[in-house]
């Protein structure tokens, strides 16, 4: 299939959630992406910040392949060595007391909102009314209801209102 045929095929079968650029990537190398016609692009977005290590670095690929051969995701209901080691590194680097792992940025935002509310509830009690989340204008944090509630860009928020309350911009 040509690139245009592939893009049309995707439009027929995949829910349209973003305005996409008219390019279809085939593979990546370092900080570059290559489309199906061989054109090279510098990935300034790093896959919307989830590919900050780039693409196909030998050490990265080897570590992923090694882990895939052993075990993939099993949730945080069970213990596993890589998660314990990563948690220790994060605690040491951050100075915080615990690490919290999630599957996505959306879950990280939801976890942060819940942690802030739980902290205020535990420290001050329900009657203190200290539940407000302060959010930034012109921000974007994801597409879940909690993330949209703290997204300070109206055109993302408006179609899904009413959102989670107690947010101040």
Regions found by a protein language model. Give the residues of each.
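Solvent-exposed alpha-helices and their adjacent loops that cap or buttress functional pockets
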Residues: 24-26, 91-94, 125-128, 159-163
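Short beta-strand-to-turn element immediately C-terminal to the catalytic PLP-Schiff-base lysine
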Residues: 34-35, 53-55, 149-150
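PLP-dependent aminotransferase-class I/II
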Residues: 136-169
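Active-site and channel-lining beta-strand-loop segments
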Residues: 23-43
């Amino acid at each position: 299939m040509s690139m245009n045929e592939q893009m049309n095929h995707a439009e027929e079968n995949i829910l349209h959630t973003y305005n996409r650029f008219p390019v279809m990537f085939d593979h990546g190398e370092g900080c570059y992406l290559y489309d199906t016609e061989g054109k090279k692009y510098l990935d300034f977005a790093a896959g919307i910040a989830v590919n900050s290590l780039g693409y196909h670095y030998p050490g990265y690929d080897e570590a992923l392949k090694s882990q895939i051969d052993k075990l993939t995701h099993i949730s945080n209901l069970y213990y596993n060595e890589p998660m314990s080691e990563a948690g220790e590194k994060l605690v040491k680097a951050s100075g915080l007391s615990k690490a919290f792992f999630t599957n996505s940025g959306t879950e990280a935002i939801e976890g942060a909102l819940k942690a802030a509310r739980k902290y205020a509830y535990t420290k001050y009690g329900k009657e203190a009314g200290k539940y407000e989340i302060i959010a930034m204008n012109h921000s974007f944090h994801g597409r879940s209801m909690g993330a949209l509630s703290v997204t300070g860009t109206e055109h993302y928020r408006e179609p899904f209102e009413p959102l989670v309350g107690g947010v101040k911009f």
